């Protein structure tokens, strides 16, 4: 076997292989012997068919199969010998074949980039230092009450915490625009659903009033034709409702799994959940900065085959989220996912190199802790832990999570990490 390797472009490679004629003939004869043992031909007992008849009847197909097998096996031998690491499926390009002559073919493929991590010491990470205060718990309790609120119609003017039912028609330069009109639109004030100035224009008005407000669409608004444009909205205010918050009664508290129904018990449960969320938020904030720094410090080429594969994964995930099927998933434009796919591949390659250079393996104690932390959010944590322990795929996924955490910690060990005092609300809003 003769082998030559050339770089086509970037990570592209072409391996050209020549297989000697005698190697092909030996393999063909060997396979014909195997065929002769199995075939049934009228007039001959099984395994007793003369080789010339077997060759006459099956020679062409056997030779084709043998060539395909030799191409595959010799390519594998070649990349092992040349220490090449292909990324994605290879493309075989057979040359002209003539019986009794050497056979030359080529294989085109991409290789994984050679990653040499640099700049880890220059990565800057700001670790949030946060504690859950009594005031944070008060805010969360208020949020829980608002989620269970009832609404009661009122006669007074709408204010920042009310809910209104309106008809509205929007126009720019006197012309109505698509999506700018609605009837019986229910708007809970104070949630930032509308463009700046809209809710302020509604506040102070009563049911039965019709009025016009002037607003300006933000420069970053999603509709290109409305970015930065001044608009008028004619509004008919049909109904104003005020929020009624439930009291922290024993019955209300027990809805959240607090068996004794006490306010102290609810506060303790809320604090525990907030601290669990906080732990995850701090971890994610630090991780995202470490990975961002790693990516910026290491500019690497990425095999197109890996990006294509990741795009297919993202397509399928998107289709599943919106109830689509496999066919619909593959029809989604690749442009929607290309940037995210490339980013994921780059991060995977860089973290993979961190894992390799640090000889990391998933810490089973960490895996156990991650499962327990995740399970604590469920009503029966023991049942969840047992379910994970009996599911190999779930356990492998959690080991990957643990290994990724360990890789991030290896990056942080060399990075410049500082601490910054932050409030619970500020950190959680950053995560949103």
UniProtKB/Swiss-Prot annotation:
GO terms for biological process: 'de novo' cotranslational protein folding; cell division; chaperone-mediated protein folding; protein transport; protein unfolding. Keywords: Cell cycle, Cell division, Chaperone, Cytoplasm, Isomerase, Rotamase. Transmembrane segments: none annotated. It is found in: Cytoplasm. GO terms for cellular component: cytoplasm. It catalyses: [protein]-peptidylproline (omega=180) = [protein]-peptidylproline (omega=0). Pfam families: FKBP_C, Trigger_C, Trigger_N. Its main location: cytoplasm. The keyword Mitochondrion does not apply. It is an enzyme of class 5 (isomerase). The keyword Hydrolase does not apply. Residues 161-246 form the PPIase FKBP-type domain. Involved in protein export. Acts as a chaperone by maintaining the newly synthesized protein in an open conformation. Functions as a peptidyl-prolyl cis-trans isomerase. NCBIfam families: tig. Consists of 3 domains; the N-terminus binds the ribosome, the middle domain has PPIase activity, while the C-terminus has intrinsic chaperone activity on its own. Belongs to the FKBP-type PPIase family. Tig subfamily. HAMAP family: Trigger_factor_Tig. This is Trigger factor.
């Amino acid at each position: 076997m003769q082998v030559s390797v050339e770089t086509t472009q970037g990570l592209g490679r072409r391996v050209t292989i020549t297989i000697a004629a005698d190697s092909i003939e030996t393999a063909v004869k060997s396979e014909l012997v195997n065929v002769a043992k199995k075939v049934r031909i009228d007039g001959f007992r099984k395994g007793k068919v003369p080789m010339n008849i077997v060759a006459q009847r099956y020679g062409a197909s056997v030779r084709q199969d043998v060539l395909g097998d030799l191409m595959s096996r010799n390519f594998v031998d070649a990349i092992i010998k040349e220490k090449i690491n292909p990324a994605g499926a290879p493309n075989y390009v057979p040359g002209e074949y003539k019986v009794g002559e050497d056979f030359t073919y080529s294989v085109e493929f991409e290789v994984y980039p050679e990653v040499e991590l640099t700049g880890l010491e220059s990565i800057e990470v700001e670790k949030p230092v946060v504690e859950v205060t009594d005031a944070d718990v008060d805010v969360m309790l208020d949020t829980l009450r608002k989620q269970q609120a009832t609404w009661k119609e009122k006669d007074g003017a709408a204010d920042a915490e009310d809910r209104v039912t309106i008809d509205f028609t929007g126009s720019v330069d006197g012309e109505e625009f698509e999506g700018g009109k609605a009837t019986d639109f229910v708007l809970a004030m104070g949630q930032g659903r509308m463009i700046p100035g809209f809710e302020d224009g509604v506040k102070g008005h009563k049911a039965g009033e019709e009025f016009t407000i002037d607003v300006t669409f933000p420069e970053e608004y999603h509709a290109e034709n409305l970015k930065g444009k001044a608009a008028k909205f004619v509004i008919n205010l049909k109904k104003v409702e005020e929020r009624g918050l439930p009291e922290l009664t024993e019955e209300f508290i027990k809805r959240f799994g607090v068996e004794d129904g006490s306010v102290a018990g609810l506060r303790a449960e809320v604090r525990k959940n907030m601290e669990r969320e906080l732990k995850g938020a701090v971890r994610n904030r630090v991780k995202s900065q470490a990975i961002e720094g790693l990516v910026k410090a290491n500019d690497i080429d990425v095999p197109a085959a890996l990006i294509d594969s990741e795009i297919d994964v993202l397509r399928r995930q998107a289709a599943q989220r919106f109830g689509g099927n496999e066919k619909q998933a593959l029809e989604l434009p690749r442009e929607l996912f290309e940037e995210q796919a490339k980013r994921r591949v780059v991060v995977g390659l860089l973290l993979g190199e961190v894992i390799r250079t640090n000889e990391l393996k998933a810490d089973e104690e960490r895996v156990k802790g991650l499962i327990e932390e995740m399970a604590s959010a469920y009503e029966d944590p023991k049942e969840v832990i047992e379910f994970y322990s009996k599911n190999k795929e779930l356990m492998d996924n959690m080991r990957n999570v643990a290994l990724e955490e360990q890789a991030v910690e290896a990056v942080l060990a060399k990075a410049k990490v500082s601490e910054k005092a932050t409030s619970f609300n500020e950190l959680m809003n950053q995560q949103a």
